[in-house]
Amino acid sequence: MITDYFSLEGKRALVTGAGKGIGARIATAFAEMGADVALVARTQSDLDAVATEIRQLGREAHTFACDVTDEAALTSVVQTLTEAWGSLDILINNAGAPGQGYGSLKKVTKARFENTIDINLTSAYTLTHLALPLLKAAPQGSIVNVSSALGWMVDRNFAAYGAAKAGMDQMTRILAYELAPSIRVNGIAPGAIETPSTAFISQNEDMYNATVRWIPQGRLGKPDDIALAALYLASNASGFVSGKIIEVDGGMAALPGTAIEANIARTMATE
C-alpha cells in the first residue's frame, strides 16, 4: 500500500524545540505514525505535556530539559539515547528563535549576533555531529532541519536570524552530499505559522490582514502543515529525496517582493 511509505512504525526520532508549537506537533505526529520520540526543549512542564500525549498513543517518550546551545547537555542527551535505543532513525533540528540578534545593525552587537547564530545554526550542527554514530547505526537515517522563509526573504532587523537560517539551508545541502547514501538530509522553510510565538498576529485583526495579504493561500500556516512536511521527509515516502528545502509558506516564495509582508505588519504594530 502506498500509505505504508509514510509509516514510522518501529522508528525512533529525536526532536528539538519540542515543547510547543511546530516541534511539539512534529513529535506527536510522528508518534501517531508509530515512532518513539525523544523530546528536547527548555521547559520541563512543556515536555511533560507533549510526552503524555505520546505515551497515550502507546509510544515511548524521553524528555530532556536543556538549552540546545549547551554542548555538554546535548552530549548527555545523545549518551542517554545511545544507552536506551542504540540507534536513531530520525533527527529533527527544529529549535530556533531570533534570540538577542533581532534588531538593526546599529543595535546588534557581535555578542548578540553570535547568540542568534548559536541558537539557530551552531546548535543544529553540534547535535548532528554528536548524533551521527546513532544515525549511522540505523538502517537508513533521516535528518530534517527546520529553517525559515527568512533564510531567503529580505526583512529589516533579521540580519542575524536570516544569516543563521540561510546557513542552515546550505548546511543541509552539503551534509546531504556528504552523508549519502546512508543518511538523507533535507530541510523545511516555514513561512508565517500560527504558534504561541506568533499569536500576536492572529490577535490583531489589522496585523493579521496585512500579513495574509501577501500569502496566496490567504491564511497563516498551522503546525500541522509543517508536521506533514516533516513526516514526508522523515519517512520512506521521500526515500529518493535528499538535499532539498521544502518551502511551506502558502505560496509566498512564488511572489516578488515578499519582504513587504513582514514590514507592513510590523509597521502597523508600531503605529
Where are the model-predicted features located?
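C-terminal helical subdomain
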Residues: 187-190, 206-237, 241, 248-250
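Active-site helix of classical SDR
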Residues: 128, 164, 172
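Conserved glycine-rich cofactor-binding loop
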Residues: 12, 17-21
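Substrate-binding pocket helix/loop in short-chain dehydrogenase/reductase
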Residues: 102-105, 109-114, 211
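The beta1-alpha1 cofactor-binding region of Rossmann-like NAD(H)/NADP(H)-dependent oxidoreductases
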Residues: 45, 65-77, 110, 224-225
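Alpha-helical segment proximal to the catalytic Tyr-Lys
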Residues: 133, 176-181, 239
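Residue(s) in the substrate-gating loop at a strand-loop-helix junction
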Residues: 148
